[in-house]
Each structure stands twice: as C-alpha cells, then as structure tokens.
Amino acid sequence: MPLFALLVLVAAAAPAQESAVSLPPFLVEEAAKGPPWRHGEAMGFEILSRCGDSATRRVVEAHFQLHQLLGEMLPPSLRWQSSVPPLLILYDEELQPAASQEVIRQMLRRADAPEPEFGAMPGGRGLRMPSAAPRYSFLPNLRLWDRDGMAIFMIVRRDQVDADRLSLTYDYVNFLVRQRLPLLPAWFVGGLLTLYQKTEYGSGQLTVPAVDWFSPLPTEAQLKDPAVPSPVWSLPEVLQQRLPAPGTTGLPAGADPAKAWQAHAALLVRWGLEADKQAHRAGMWRFIERSAFEGTSEALFRECLGFGYDEARRRLAAFLPVAARRSFRLKPARPAKLPPFPLTNASDLQIACIKGDWERLEVPYVRGISAELAPKYLDQARRTLRRAYDRDHRDPRLLAVMGLCEVDGGDDTAARGFLESAAALGPIRPRASQELGRLRLAEARANPAGANGRIDTNQTVRVLEPLFAARAALPPLPEVYELIAQVWAASDAKPTLRHLAVIDEGVKLFPRRIALVRLAAELYVRDGHREQADAFIELGLRVAEDEPTRAIFSALRAR
C-alpha cells in the first residue's frame, strides 16, 4: 500500500528578532513501500500506528503508566471528558523519506513563499540557514483539539520508548483541567497547575515540589503562640480569591497578590494530597467535584473533610513548614497493568476517519500561524476523507468528519449534505450535531413557516433534534445551549418553564458566557418570568466586561 510520508514544515528563519513558525505534520502519499497502518483501542484512546506492533505497545504502555501516575494528582473524574474517543497517532521516525524536503519546497512555492537558495538538507535542524530560506524539521509530538475531541500525534523512535524518560506535558494537563466541565474551582486549578509545573516523573512515581512560599516561614514557637497571626489566609480568602489588603499580615508589603494566592492554593492542594498520611485525599476529591456543581461552602467542606474552615486553617498553618521545605513522592499503591489489546491492519475507513480528522484539526491551527498554507492542509484533509468516500463508504463517523471539515473550510452548503447524511445513518459526535442544528436553524429562519415571520412547531422540533442529541453527549458545548435559546426566541411556540430549564442548565455550566446569559434573560423577560429573569440579569451585570454590555442588562432590568 502507498506510504504516507510525514512532513513537518518550519517556516523561513526570520531576522534575529523574529522566531520561526512551526507547522504541524503534513501527510503526503508517496509510492514507497512500508508497513501498513495498524489500528487498536486502549485506555479509551483510538490508536492508528505506522510503527511495529512492539513499539506501538511500548508507547501505549508508557502512555498508560503516565496517566496512572497523573491519577495520583488528578483523578479521572476531575479531567476533561468526551464522548468522542481521543486519537493517538504514532509514526515510525525511520519511515521519513529522503525526498520529503523537496515536497515541502514545492508546496511552499505554490504558496508563493520565497524560493530557497540551497538544496534539501535532511537533518538540517541544527544548521543555521539563510534568513530568506525555509528550514524543515520534524515536530515529534503535537496535540490538537476540537470543541468535542482531541488528537495526539507522536513520532516514535524505536529505541527510546521508556516511561521513565517521558512525562505528560504541562500544556496537556492544563487542557485536561481547564476544559473540564462543570468548571473546576479556580483555587484547585491554580494550585494544581502551580505544583505540576515543577513535578517530575521517574522510577514509577511523581515527585511533587515544595511550595514556593511568598514570605518568611513561621517558627514552631510562632505557630504555637495564639497571639501571633496565622501565616495562612482564611479558607474563604483562598477558596474565593478574596485577597487581603496589601501591607497586612496576610499580604506583606511588596508581595505579589496573585503569587501569594497561588502559593495558598498550592498549599491547600499539597495538603490534600499528602497531609496525615494522605488521609484527606478522597474527601478533597469529593469536595472539589461537588464544588464544581454546587459551589463552595463551609457546610460542603465539613461534609467532605469532617471539619470546618477554622480547623482547616490551623492544619494548613501547621503543614506549611513541611510543604515549603521539601518535596514529596506519589505513586499508586498497586500499579495497574494495561489489559492486552489487539492490533489489526487498519481498514480504509479507519485510516480515513482518524487521519482525516487529524488533518482537519491541523487546518485552523495552520490558519492561525501561516494562513497562506492553510488551503494546502484543507485540500489534504479533503483528499484523505474523499478516498474512503469514493470507495462507497457511507459511515456516519466518516460523513460527520467530512461535514466538520467543510464547516471549518467555510463551505456550509457542502457541510449540510454530509451532516444530514451522517445523522440519518446513526448517532454522530456532539459538535457535528451542534453544527447540523445551526445549519437547520439558519434554513428555518430564512424560510419561516410560522406566524409573524417566526418558525413553526415542525421547524422548531427539527432544529432542536440534533441540539438535544449533542446535549446528551460529552463534553457540554456552550454553542448548543445558545442555539437552543435562539430556537425558542425564533419560534412561534411559547416555551414552558420546563423547556427553559435546559437553558438554565447551560448558564450553570457556562456562567461567564455572556451571550448565553443575555439570551436566557431576554427569553424570561419576554415570557413574563420576572423572578428568573432578574437572576440572569444580575449575573449578566456581574460578568459583563464592558459598559455597552452592562447597558443591555440594565435595559432588560428596566423592562
């Protein structure tokens, strides 16, 4: 079968004050021999590999071990989750063809880039090139994501697959924490990421660093003296980011308030992980998870941890000297083993769905850093997807990815056909359902069948159908709730409070999504539900970032 050669562009080296532009992998068909793509599923990931089976298994095993270690700091329940399995694409480094550089040069010429004045230089990553010419090199590890999915691409060196030499990047963990819904409490996100920045992997364990404290540490005598103010803030100040006044005991003159809060948040997370022989970990996880749904309160803290804020402050103060002076190690009590998983030759459909989805994700990434090359990436994604489509594959997953590819490429007309066909064949991913709902709403608005230029009940139901399918999947998408609100705003059918409760759900998930808050407030005002409307108006006034937006909510309050 043809070889898909991995090509990675790094744009021309700019003058000294400018940096090169790194572009993601570009997979080009070449008439060369090579091993087949292999397919498998493990630890929730869907795997497409161009490596030998033994290397593939070593990578997946290492991936599994790293996530097991991460679970000691960040359990799966507190990470981003999706109904769409994340993709792991592996490519053997030794399959790089010698002609790769020339292919890239030709593509850059077609994009009107400067013609290099030197020949192809494999391995030229360490060479200093003329400023007018492009440099090319492999990008060995890249993660891209959509609103409902994620994909990881790795170039694998056969002799360097060792979990003790690998780690999960800060960027990856930052994504897992910040994209998790409902949103995790800010103190936990800040504290965990502050610690994770310097956390080290090795020997089957995590080494968590000492807390970088912002002021001199208290002595043992000071900690025991009730006349000496506590060296740590009260729990409400930490949990709710209520910073003490500068120059006070809690915030000495010259201390950075943000760094002081981060230090407290890191101390609280570190205490939850380590203190009293890790006795508080399960309770801390429960408190964090429930806080994301219910909000933070002392009653919840007491229920989960067994004591209140004052006692927690005392314990944090006693723990501070330990946390600020030494690191500590975390490892699973009983290391889990990855269950065996089969690897089989990937079908044309599997290659198209996985590789095409990856290439689709590359397009907006490239558009943001080198817009003139984005059409080349879009063309390649379309070719990959079309290859299976032209062989009469009509799978809902393939059609959904093709539809999203056209949406991202700006062709809603083509996208609509693929998305409708996908939805008719079976369940599709949440973003595909959301985009189908958006396109159906646009059509209904352009051809309203209801009274007074509104869409009628049949149109309303048809638009809501894919939106509610998306709502039932993970992750929740704010656009889904905004579209549901727009449907009710455009419909000649009056929604009940039960219907509107779905929009309430969206606001709880996305309280800072000002467009959604505004739509909710307008609907409740329009339909005479004053109490609920006032709650959304007050929220909008709190989270609005400019005066024109605040003026909109003030006008709603006056209606």
Map each language-model feature to its residues.
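Terminal, low-structured helical/coil segments at or just beyond the last alpha-helical repeat
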Residues: 506, 519-522, 526-559
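Acidic/His/Gly-enriched intrinsically disordered linker/tail segments
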Residues: 32-33, 121-152, 180-340
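Alpha-helical adaptor scaffolds
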Residues: 404-407, 435-445, 453-458, 468-505
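Beta/coil-rich, acidic/histidine-enriched accessory regions frequently appended to metallopeptidases
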Residues: 19, 291-448, 528, 532-535, ...
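Non-catalytic architectural context of zinc metalloproteases
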Residues: 16-165, 180, 200, 247-261, ...
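Active-site recognition of the HExxH zinc-binding catalytic motif
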Residues: 44, 166-179, 190-194, 269
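Short coil turns that delineate tetratricopeptide repeat
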Residues: 393, 427, 475-476, 511, ...
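Alpha-helical repeat scaffolds
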Residues: 377-386, 414-422, 451-471, 495-507, ...
